[in-house]
C-alpha cells in the first residue's frame, strides 16, 4: 500500500493549495488589521499539556512516544499550546496579548469511524489577559469581519453563555444535572424527556432549556421569567449588554441566534460560547467555534495565577467547501509568466541566464525553463494547455524571440 496515504490522511493538490492559501492569507490580513500577531507553537506537545485544560480526552489525541518515554501527542487544537506559550514565554510583555495562528491539527476519529479525516487546518485568534464585555464584543465582531471578507455566501453565529446555562441548570440535583447537561450538549431530546425527574417542575425546566434558542430578544424574554441565582443574573445582564453592543457597532445587524442550550459536556468555557455556521448545497457547515475560558491560563501558569482569555478557531476546510460553489476562490493554480526555451543544446547557458535576468528584473514573475527538448508545435501546445503567457525562444548568438 505504499502508493496510498494512510487511512484518514489526504494530499492537497496545487489548485486546492492555492485556494486554501487565499483563505488563510485573507484571514491573516484581517487578524493583522485588528492588531493580532502571529504565533507558531510546536506540533508536538506533552500529553498532560494537551489534557490539562479539561477539553481533550486521551482517545482524541494521536499519541507519540520518544526515547525518553514521555507521553506526547500531536496537537488536536491550538488554544492549549498558545496559552502555555503565553504564560511561560511572554510573561513580561504588555497586556492584553492579541495572538493569531494558522496551523494544522490532528484528531483521532470517534470509535467505529476508522478512515475518517485525521488532519485539519485551522486559523484563529486568542485574546489573552482581557475580560469583560468589550473583549467579548471584539471577538464576535472579528469573527463576523473574517466571514464577510471571505464573502461566505450564507452564515450566522450561534451564541450561548456557559455561565448562564450553568446557572439555569443549578436547581437540578447533581447527578441529574450532569445527565441533563449531557443531553443538551448532544441534542438528545428523547433521552432528556425520559430522565427520572423528582417533580414536573424540573422536567418542564429541562424541556424549556432544550428549546432556549432563537432570536435574542425572544430567548431573553423567556429567561427573565426563570429563577436565577446572583451569578445567573450577572451573566444575563452581561449577555444583554454584549448583544446590544455588537448590534450597535456595525452598519448591519449581526446574523445572531441565541442558544442557551449551547454547552459542552465538560467545564472548559466560563462565559460566552459561540459557533459560526455556513450553508452549502443545503447542508450546514461548522465554520468555526470559540468562547471565553477564564480558568485555562491559570492551569499553565507556573504560580497558577488565573487570567481571562477568549478566542476562536475557523475551520479552513469548511470555509473552502462553502466557497467552492462561488467564483470567489482562485480557479487555477498560479500561472507561469514566461517559458524560456533553448532551441539548441548550445543555447542552454543563454536560456538559463535569460530566465534568471527576468526573475531579477521583476521578482513577482514566475519563469520556467523548458526541459523536454520538444519541437515548436509541442511547446506551443504545452504553453496553451498550462496558461503560460509568454514563450521566449533562445538561440546562441541571436536575439531572443518573444511570443
From Swiss-Prot:
This function is generally fulfilled by the C-terminal part of HisG, which is missing in some bacteria such as this one. Belongs to the class-II aminoacyl-tRNA synthetase family. HisZ subfamily. Required for the first step of histidine biosynthesis. May allow the feedback regulation of ATP phosphoribosyltransferase activity by histidine. Keywords: Amino-acid biosynthesis, Cytoplasm, Histidine biosynthesis. The keyword Cytoplasm applies. InterPro entries: aa-tRNA-synth_II/BPL/LPL, HisRS-like_core, HisRS/HisZ, HisZ. GO terms for biological process: histidyl-tRNA aminoacylation; L-histidine biosynthetic process. SUPFAM superfamilies: Class II aaRS and biotin synthetases (SSF55681). Pathway: Amino-acid biosynthesis; L-histidine biosynthesis; L-histidine from 5-phospho-alpha-D-ribose 1-diphosphate: step 1/9. GO terms for molecular function: histidine-tRNA ligase activity. Its main location: cytoplasm. One of its GO terms (cellular component) is cytoplasm. It is found in: Cytoplasm. Heteromultimer composed of HisG and HisZ subunits. This is ATP phosphoribosyltransferase regulatory subunit.
Amino acid at each position: 500500500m505504499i502508493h496510498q496515504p494512510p487511512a484518514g490522511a489526504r494530499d492537497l493538490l496545487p489548485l486546492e493549495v492555492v485556494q486554501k492559501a487565499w483563505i488563510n492569507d485573507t484571514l491573516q490580513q484581517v487578524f493583522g488589521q485588528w492588531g493580532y500577531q502571529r504565533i507558531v507553537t510546536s506540533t508536538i506537545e506533552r500529553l498532560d499539556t494537551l489534557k490539562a485544560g479539561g477539553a481533550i480526552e486521551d482517545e482524541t489525541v494521536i499519541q507519540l512516544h520518544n526515547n525518553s518515554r514521555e507521553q506526547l501527542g500531536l496537537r488536536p487544537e491550538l488554544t492549549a499550546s498558545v496559552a502555555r506559550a503565553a504564560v511561560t514565554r511572554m510573561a513580561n510583555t504588555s497586556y492584553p496579548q492579541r495572538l493569531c495562528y494558522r496551523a494544522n491539527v490532528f484528531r483521532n476519529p470517534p470509535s467505529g469511524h476508522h478512515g475518517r479525516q485525521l488532519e485539519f487546518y485551522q486559523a484563529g485568534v486568542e485574546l489573552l489577559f482581557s475580560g469583560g464585555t468589550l473583549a467579548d464584543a471584539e471577538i464576535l465582531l472579528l469573527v463576523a469581519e473574517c466571514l464577510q471578507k471571505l464573502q461566505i455566501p450564507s452564515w450566522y453565529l450561534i451564541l450561548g453563555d456557559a455561565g448562564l446555562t450553568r446557572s439555569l441548570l443549578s436547581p437540578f440535583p447533581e447527578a441529574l444535572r450532569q445527565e441533563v447537561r449531557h443531553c443538551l450538549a448532544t441534542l438528545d431530546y428523547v433521552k432528556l424527556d425520559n430522565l427520572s425527574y423528582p417533580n414536573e417542575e424540573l422536567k418542564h425546566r429541562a424541556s424549556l432549556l432544550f428549546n432556549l434558542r432563537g432570536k435574542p430578544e425572544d430567548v431573553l424574554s423567556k429567561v427573565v421569567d426563570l429563577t436565577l441565582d446572583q451569578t445567573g443574573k450577572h451573566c444575563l445582564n452581561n449577555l444583554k449588554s454584549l448583544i446590544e453592543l455588537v448590534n450597535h457597532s456595525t452598519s448591519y445587524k449581526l446574523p445572531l441566534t441565541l442558544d442557551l442550550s449551547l454547552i459542552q459536556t465538560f467545564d472548559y468555557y466560563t462565559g460566552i460560547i459561540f459557533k459560526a455556521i455556513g450553508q452549502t448545497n443545503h447542508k450546514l457547515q461548522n465554520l468555526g467555534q470559540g468562547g471565553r475560558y477564564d480558568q485555562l491560563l491559570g492551569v499553565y501558569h507556573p504560580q497558577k495565577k488565573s487570567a481571562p482569555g477568549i478566542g476562536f478557531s475557523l475551520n479552513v476546510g469548511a470555509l473552502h467547501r462553502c466557497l467552492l460553489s462561488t467564483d470567489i476562490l482562485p480557479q487555477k493554480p498560479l500561472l507561469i509568466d514566461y517559458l524560456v526555451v533553448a532551441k539548441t543544446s548550445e543555447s542552454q547557458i543563454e536560456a538559463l541566464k535569460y530566465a534568471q535576468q527576468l526573475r531579477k528584473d521583476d521578482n513577482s514573475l514566475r519563469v520556467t525553463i523548458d526541459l523536454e527538448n520538444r519541437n515548436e508545435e509541442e511547446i506551443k501546445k504545452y504553453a496553451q494547455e498550462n496558461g503560460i503567457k509568454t514563450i521566449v525562444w533562445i538561440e546562441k548568438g541571436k536575439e531572443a524571440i518573444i511570443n
